Design a protein with these regions (language model features):
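Conserved "HGTGT" condensation-loop signature of ketosynthase/thiolase-family condensing enzymes
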Residues: 1-175, 179-186, 191-256
Length: 256
C-alpha cells in the first residue's frame, strides 16, 4: 500500500482590523469612539448626526430599515478606517482621478433575519390588489439590496456577498473576508452582519448591524485597532492568542 504524505497545515494569516462601526438599539458608533457596542432587544434607530454624515447620492430615507442600519454601519466602519469622509467638499478633477484608481474594497455581510420584515411589508401591498404593489419596497426584498446601496454611496468596487447564517455570529462572513484578502483580488474587505428581527425577540437575536474593515496591508495611514490571526484550517480567529468564536467576542477584545 502506498502511503502519501499528508499536506502541511495552512499557515495562519494576520489581518489588520482598521475600522469598526455599528448600529444597535442601545448605542451607535465607531472604533475611535472608545466605547463598546452594546446589544439588546428592540428596534434600532439611527441618530440624526450619523444620518446627516452619511447623506449623499440617493435619499437615505427611501431605504427600508434593514438597509438603513446596514448602510449606516458600513459607513461608520469606512469612516473609522479613513475610507469615507463625512460631508466631503465638492470633488475636483484630481479627486475624480484618485477615485478612478481607488483601492478595491469588498463587502461581505452575514444575516440571520435577512430582509424578512420588508418582504412582509411588500406582501401586504399585493395581498388585496397586485396592481398597487409597492416598487419602493420591492427593490429591498433581497438580503443583498443594501450592499448595492452601500457600494454606490461609498464607491466600493470590489466583490459583494450576503451569507445567510442560522445563528447571528458572522463567523462565516469573517472567514470569507479573510479568504478574499488571502486569495482574492480585493485589498480591503468590509465584513460583519446586519439583522432586523421581528419583535419581541430574544438573545442572541439582536437587531442591528456591525461591520469591520479588514486589511492585509495598510493602504492608508490609519490606526490599527487589532491584528486578527486567522486559522484557515479550523476557520478560527485569534487576537493576541485569545480565540474569538464570533464577531461579538472579537469586538470585546478590540474595544477592551
Amino acid at each position: 500500500m502506498t502511503i502519501f504524505p499528508s499536506s502541511p497545515p495552512a499557515p495562519r494569516t494576520d489581518v489588520m482590523v482598521t475600522g469598526l462601526g455599528w448600529i444597535s438599539t442601545v448605542n451607535s458608533g465607531c472604533g475611535t469612539d472608545k466605547r463598546k457596542p452594546v446589544w439588546d432587544v428592540g428596534i434600532p434607530t439611527i441618530p440624526d448626526s450619523i444620518l446627516n454624515s452619511l447623506k449623499g447620492g440617493s435619499r437615505f430615507g427611501r431605504l427600508d430599515l434593514f438597509s438603513q442600519i446596514g448602510v449606516a454601519a458600513v459607513g461608520l466602519a469606512l469612516q473609522d478606517a479613513g475610507y469615507f469622509q463625512a460631508n466631503p467638499p465638492a470633488a475636483t478633477e484630481t479627486d475624480r482621478q484618485l477615485r478612478d484608481n481607488a483601492t478595491s474594497i469588498a463587502l461581505i455581510s452575514s444575516t440571520t433575519s435577512s430582509c424578512n420584515l420588508t418582504d412582509r411589508d411588500f406582501y401586504k401591498t399585493v395581498q388585496n390588489d397586485p396592481g398597487l404593489a409597492s416598487p419602493g419596497l420591492f427593490v429591498y426584498t433581497l438580503a443583498t439590496s443594501f450592499l448595492g446601496e452601500a457600494a454606490l454611496r461609498f464607491s466600493l468596487t470590489g466583490a459583494s456577498m450576503a451569507v445567510i447564517e442560522p445563528q447571528p455570529h458572522a463567523g462565516t462572513a469573517l472567514s470569507f473576508a479573510c479568504e478574499e484578502l488571502i486569495n482574492g483580488d480585493d485589498e480591503v474587505v468590509v465584513t460583519g452582519f446586519c439583522n432586523l428581527f421581528e419583535q419581541p425577540s430574544v438573545a442572541p437575536n439582536f437587531s442591528g448591524a456591525l461591520f469591520l474593515v479588514l486589511e492585509k496591508e495598510l493602504k492608508k495611514t490609519t490606526r490599527v485597532h487589532a491584528v486578527l490571526n486567522y486559522d484557515p484550517e479550523a476557520e478560527l480567529f485569534y487576537i493576541k492568542d485569545q480565540p474569538c468564536p464570533d464577531i461579538f467576542s472579537l469586538c470585546e477584545l478590540i474595544c477592551g
